[in-house]
């Protein structure tokens, strides 16, 4: 697997995508580069180096040798190395240190030199995304959003808002499936018009029933499903929506300076759930064309998919998790819009103190009321 380290064309320092400038920036010589310049520069550089395929082949051969050696070890050694086998190890192209990742990680940061590392082969071939929405919210702005939410929480534990939590805030690109469809549909429905009036003490109701026929072309865009297992579903769903008008054709350089995950849920695994949702949307769209009725009940509905397009998309999320009283609490911020989602801990001591203050205030009011009536 090839590791890619995007370096500044001017000084060779690490190059990262800057959400504020929407350009690629070097923190050392303060240079900024457009996405096109970066792509052209590294495309020319890649032609002078060994191809990623050759490197991957070598590592595959090495992995086979290691697997053969591992097979000869005893059961005890296998048990001890189980955790190591589940991880994947690469060498940092900047300092040579070992970078340990999970099987789905596509971009990360070297723990030792803090330089960004992009695992090129993870997002190539069939796993290459169609598009990416770059981070628009910088880490500092994400921290400001986090602090803004914390200020509204009166019962946070003391010293909860600290630098250690800010350090853990990580920008991650998560994979999603997006589907656009065009359908031709026909509907037969029963429409009711109800009219009521009063004459004297009598109340009258008239119900007229109509047979409705509708036909037309329906377009449903941007129906999404997550493409990664093992993550908090609510967290990844609730930071939506994203403005897909700001999506770019995928380029590996956008991952520099952030973490990224490769999909491990395939299109066929979510197709049924997506179709069920689109069916519901389409039927509701057809019902909405029958206006002016008190009630509309579908009698017969059928449609045909005329066009369908799936897009494998990476979306930006700022993520932090923290442990409080043995419970892991996730917090996420939409890296494009700043929308927040998460659960913040509650201090039992502050709750008790607040309850005591309220009780004391009520008791004081009761005593005051009693004195007034003496």
Can you describe what each PLM-predicted range is?
Residues 8-11, 26-29, 92-95, 110-113:
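Short cysteine-rich clusters marking metal-coordination/redox-active sites
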Residues 14-16, 34, 100, 118:
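Short functional micro-motifs and their immediate structural scaffolds
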Residues 16-24, 101-108:
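Short linker/helix segments within small regulatory modules
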Residues 30-37, 114-121:
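Short Cys/His-rich micro-motifs in 6-15 aa windows
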Residues 127-323, 328:
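Charged, low-complexity helical/coil segments in non-catalytic cytosolic or luminal regions
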Residues 311-361:
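Extended hydrophobic
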Residues 364-374:
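Juxtamembrane boundary at the C-terminal end of a transmembrane helix
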């Amino acid at each position: 697997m090839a590791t890619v380290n995007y370096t500044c064309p001017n000084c060779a320092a690490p190059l990262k995508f800057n959400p504020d400038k929407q350009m690629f920036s070097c923190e050392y010589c303060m240079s900024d580069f457009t996405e096109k310049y970066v792509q052209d520069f590294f495309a020319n550089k890649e032609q002078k180096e060994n191809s990623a395929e050759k490197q991957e082949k070598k590592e595959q051969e090495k992995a086979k040798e290691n697997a053969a050696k591992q097979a000869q070890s005893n059961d005890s050694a296998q048990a001890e190395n189980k955790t190591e086998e589940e991880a994947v190890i690469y060498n940092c192209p900047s300092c040579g240190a070992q970078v340990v990742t999970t099987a789905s990680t596509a971009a990360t940061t070297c723990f030792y030199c803090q330089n960004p590392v992009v695992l090129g082969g993870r997002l190539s071939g069939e796993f290459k995304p169609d598009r990416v929405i770059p981070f628009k919210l910088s880490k500092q702005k994400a921290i400001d959003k986090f602090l803004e939410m914390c200020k509204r929480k009166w019962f946070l534990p003391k010293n909860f808002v600290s630098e250690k939590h800010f350090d853990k805030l990580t920008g991650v690109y998560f994979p999603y499936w997006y589907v656009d469809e065009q359908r031709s549909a026909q509907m037969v429905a029963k429409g009711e018009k109800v009219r009521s009036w009063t004459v004297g003490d009598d109340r009258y109701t008239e119900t007229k029933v109509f047979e409705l026929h509708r036909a037309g072309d329906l377009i449903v865009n941007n129906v999404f499903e997550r493409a990664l297992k093992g993550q908090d579903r609510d967290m990844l769903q609730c930071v939506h929506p994203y403005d897909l008008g700001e999506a770019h054709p995928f380029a590996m350089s956008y991952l520099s300076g952030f973490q990224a995950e490769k999909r491990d849920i395939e299109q066929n695994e979510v197709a049924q759930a997506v179709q069920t949702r689109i069916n519901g949307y389409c039927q509701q769209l057809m019902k909405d064309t029958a206006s002016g009725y008190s009630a509309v009940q579908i009698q017969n509905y059928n449609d045909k998919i005329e066009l369908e397009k799936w897009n494998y998309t990476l979306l930006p999320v700022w993520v932090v998790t923290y442990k409080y009283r043995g419970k892991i609490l996730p917090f996420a911020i939409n890296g494009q819009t700043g929308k927040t989602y998460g659960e913040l801990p509650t201090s039992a001591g502050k709750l008790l103190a607040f309850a005591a203050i309220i009780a004391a205030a009520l008791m004081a009011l009761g005593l005051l009321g009693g004195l007034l009536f003496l």
